[in-house]
Amino acid sequence: MCFQFSILYTCYLAHFGVFPRKYLVMAGIEAKFQQNPPLGTHKLFLGAHICLRILTVTATLTAAWMMITSKQTVEVYGIQVEAKYSYSSAFKFFSYANAIACGCSVLTLFPAFSLFYRGSTPMKFFFLFLHDLCMMSLVLAGCAAATAIGYVGRYGNNHAGWMAICDQFDEYCNRIRLSLMFSYLAFVFILMLTIMSANKSREIRV
């Protein structure tokens, strides 16, 4: 709207001889350049957008898989004791959160490729922003829940009488720690996607 007003005002001044007509042409070129950014920069932005989504899929899939497959059986005082992720509701929520984020990120790859090849609009980025914001909140909630239980499992809580178990279940705890690392990495990727989508959606004209 500002560019259109600037051009109309320049035309008015040029009509009455206040502005030389050469400035009218320069103003039109400048406005067109600012409204239409270089194609190479836009393609680079969309390429980075797609790469971040692929990295998000990889990180969330790895986090969910490592958590689901984390189990270990040890013998304590002659008794077989097994540790599995399904024994903790926080770990199950963590697995579901990353699995959902992975599936939804795969689905958003199709519109992301569509933006790359068929052109993009601020409204499309606004819907991607809403999706990324929801997925970021979901992954962060899963990370927070699993981190709290993992901390108790590694260090225990003397005040509550909870003993640390990672001294006996070292392999199990290591897989959970790696799973958390991948999930936090996925959170960073989704955060970057949220910022990028929000920046593009600001161009919506109301």
From Swiss-Prot:
Keyword Transmembrane belongs to the record: yes
Keywords recorded for this protein, A-Z: Cell membrane, Membrane, Transmembrane, Transmembrane helix
Pfam short name (any one): CASP_dom
Assigned GO CC terms: plasma membrane
Cytoplasmic side: 1-43, 114-124, 199-206
Topological domains annotated Extracellular: 65-92, 146-177
Domain of life: Eukaryota
Membrane topology annotation: Multi-pass membrane protein
InterPro entries: CASP/CASPL, CASP_dom, CASPL
Main subcellular localisation: membrane
Subcellular location as annotated: Cell membrane
NCBIfam families given in the database record: A_tha_TIGR01569 (TIGR01569)
Quaternary structure, from the entry: Homodimer and heterodimers.
Family affiliation: Belongs to the Casparian strip membrane proteins (CASP) family.
Name of the featured protein: CASP-like protein 1F1
Species assigned in the record: Vitis vinifera (Grape)
